[in-house]
Every structure is written in structure tokens, then in C-alpha cells.
Regions:
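Aromatic-lined glycan-binding groove of carbohydrate-active enzymes
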Residues: 61-100, 134
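Generic structural signal for well-ordered alpha-helices
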Residues: 7-11, 32-36, 66, 121, ...
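Conserved, mostly hydrophobic/aromatic
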Residues: 2, 22, 50, 69, ...
Length: 216
């Protein structure tokens, strides 16, 4: 669907009081910038926030989404801080998924659980234990220390999970701490595929050319 149609519909809802603001989620950076320019030309409401998945195991938003949000003064609310539970220590092996876990559903969820990601989660857990913290709180704290982050969306299933995650706000990481995380997964790289905006991947949004379409 053309972005002008989407923005026109959002403008209708905003002007009639059905919504207060408009934002986007998991958009490629270029699509968000395109929408901002269309909103300028047409006097439509502008996106105020982008909501992508982001964790230590997939840092690719640092290449374009983060600088875009900084340049255009957009909020950045990230989700999946525990990388589908990998950073919480839920998985012990790439081919051994707990019953009821998302990875046990196979498909893309299983592909996101990698041996490298599990190894990194174990290192994070060891560092957290040495500092009197939990791996989950430390993983969220790491995100809160990154540039441009407005908020982190969490999904606790129990009150105990919530209390643990909220402890992240009390953790202060030093430059040496942050440098240590960078040795595990360098800035802008990934070890687990959670957010791929390549336009020619098999599940690319409708309307974007694939490599094969382009070749024809």
C-alpha cells in the first residue's frame, strides 16, 4: 500500500480524535524518512516514534535506525530485549528447545536461536552473577545505556519476571562494561537474525522489488 494512503488514513483518525499520535514499527529507515517527507508535503501527521526489535544479539538498527531517529528527533522504543529469551538463559543448545517456547514452534523462531547467541548469553550470565545481578536485568540495562533509546518494551509473564526486569533501571554500566559488550557483538552487527530490512528477502513487504524481479 502506498504510504500516502496510510498517512491519509492516519490523518483522518487523528483529526477526529480517535488517536493522539502516529508512529511506526519495524520500518526500514528509508521508509520512515519517506513517510516524514510525504507528511511534510501533504500536511499529514508525522511519525513520532519508531519501534524496532533490539538486543545485544542483533545490533543492526545502530547502522541506520538509531542515527535516523537522532537526525529526525524521533523516539525509539525497542522491543525483544532478551532476544526471544536467549539472553534470559532459556535455551541451552541450538537444537534443544523447551516445551512451550517460541523456538519449539520452529520456522523463524527456531532460526533465531543460534549456538553463538547461546554462548554469548552464558557469558552475559556469568558477568551478571559476578556483579550481583541477573542476566535479564543486565541485558535490558545494556539497551538503556545505548544512544537515542526512549524506552524498552518488556513482556514479563509473572510478577517476579517484572521485578527482575525493573532492576535494570538501577544498573549503571561503565565505559569498560560497554566496551566488554562490544567485544561480544560489535556495534552494528548481529549473531541472531531478528530484524532484517533487506528488500529482496523472501518475506519482504509487498511492493518492494526482489533481486529476481529486478533482474527481469
Amino acid at each position: 500500500m502506498p504510504q500516502e494512503e496510510t498517512l491519509s488514513a492516519l490523518d483522518y483518525l487523528l483529526n477526529r480524535g480517535y488517536i493522539r499520535h502516529v508512529a511506526c514499527s519495524t520500518h526500514p529507515a528509508w521508509r520512515t524518512v519517506e513517510a516524514l517527507h510525504i507528511a511534510d508535503r501533504k500536511n499529514y501527521p508525522k511519525f513520532i516514534c519508531e519501534q524496532p526489535p533490539y538486543s545485544l544479539l542483533d545490533r543492526r538498527i545502530e547502522n541506520d535506525i538509531v542515527p535516523m531517529c537522532q537526525a529526525y528527533d524521533l523516539g525509539l522504543m525497542t522491543w525483544s530485549p532478551l532476544a526471544q529469551g536467549v539472553l534470559a538463559g532459556r535455551y541451552q543448545a541450538q537444537d534443544a528447545f523447551p516445551d512451550g517456547s517460541r523456538a519449539s514452534q520452529k520456522s523463524i523462531y527456531a532460526e533465531r536461536v543460534t549456538d553463538r547467541g547461546i554462548h554469548i548469553s552464558q557469558l552475559v550470565s556469568e558477568r551478571a552473577l559476578a556483579g550481583g545481578q541477573t542476566a535479564t536485568a543486565l541485558a535490558v540495562a545494556w539497551i538503556l545505556h545505548q544512544p537515542a533509546i526512549s524506552s524498552v518494551i518488556i513482556g514479563p509473564r509473572t510478577p517476579a519476571h517484572l521485578e527482575d526486569l525493573l532492576r535494570a533501571d538501577d544498573i549503571r554500566l561503565s565505559p569498560d562494561d560497554l566496551a566488554w559488550f562490544d567485544t561480544l557483538v560489535p556495534p552494528g552487527t548481529f549473531v541472531s537474525d531478528h530484524f532484517n530490512t533487506a528488500g529482496w528477502r523472501p518475506d519482504a513487504p509487498d511492493g518492494l522489488l526482489t533481486r529476481w524481479d529486478d533482474a527481469e
